[in-house]
Swiss-Prot record:
Taxonomic placement: Archaea, Methanobacteriati, Methanobacteriota, Methanomada group, Methanococci
InterPro entries (UniProt xref): Ribosomal_uS15 (IPR000589), Ribosomal_uS15_arc_euk (IPR023029), Ribosomal_uS15_N (IPR012606), uS15_NS1_RNA-bd_sf (IPR009068)
Keyword annotations of the record: Ribonucleoprotein, Ribosomal protein
Region (Disordered), start-end ranges: 1-20
Superkingdom in the source lineage: Archaea
Protein name (database record): Small ribosomal subunit protein uS15
Keyword Nucleotide-binding: no
One GO biological process term: translation
Organism: Methanococcus maripaludis (strain C5 / ATCC BAA-1333)
GO MF entry, a single one: structural constituent of ribosome
GO annotation, cellular component aspect: cytosolic small ribosomal subunit
PROSITE patterns in the record: RIBOSOMAL_S15 (PS00362)
Family: Belongs to the universal ribosomal protein uS15 family.
Length: 151
């Protein structure tokens, strides 16, 4: 599979082992995991970071295998999931930081190209999320509204 904005191939990654039952070495129960997810969500952590913490510090290999629900669905049930999806939010944050950099360094052409690529990816994601009804049909990306959302 190729990279999105280059002709290069992507680096191959390892695949998650196929498991159907919970490993016996996992010490936390499903209720404890859900409580820990809600606790970390209250602290303002994103779902990807919560998954990494559960994996690295608590030895939980796969939340969905143990609880039957994903981290983001547990956060939605508890009311801690944002109205804008996390991948879109992170891209908007990246675009805002790049815009701030370009205000101070207007001749940085490489960053200008990078900003165009990031914003085209944002528009593609917005189109997808509008089609799947995650975002409202009239939701549009603009740098000003993104700055208000992120800050």
């Amino acid at each position: 599979m190729a990279r999105l904005h280059s002709g290069k191939r992507g680096s191959s990654g390892s695949t998650r082992p196929l498991r159907t039952e919970v490993p016996e070495w996992v010490s936390m129960s499903a209720e404890e995991i859900e409580a820990k997810i809600v606790e970390m969500a209250k602290d303002g952590k994103q779902s990807a970071i919560i998954g990494n913490i559960l994996r690295d510090m608590y030895g939980v290999p796969n939340v969905k295998l143990i609880t039957g629900k994903s981290v983001s669905s547990i956060m939605k049930e508890a009311g801690f999931y944002a109205e804008v999806p996390e991948d879109l939010f992170n891209l908007m944050k990246k675009a805002i930081n790049l815009r701030n950099h370009l205000e101070n360094n207007p001749r940085d052409t490489h960053s200008t190209v990078g900003l165009k690529l990031i914003e085209s990816k944002i528009r593609r994601l917005v189109k997808y999320y509008r089609g799947t009804k995650v975002l409202p049909a009239k939701w549009r990306y603009s740098p000003e509204t993104a700055r208000l959302l992120v800050e």
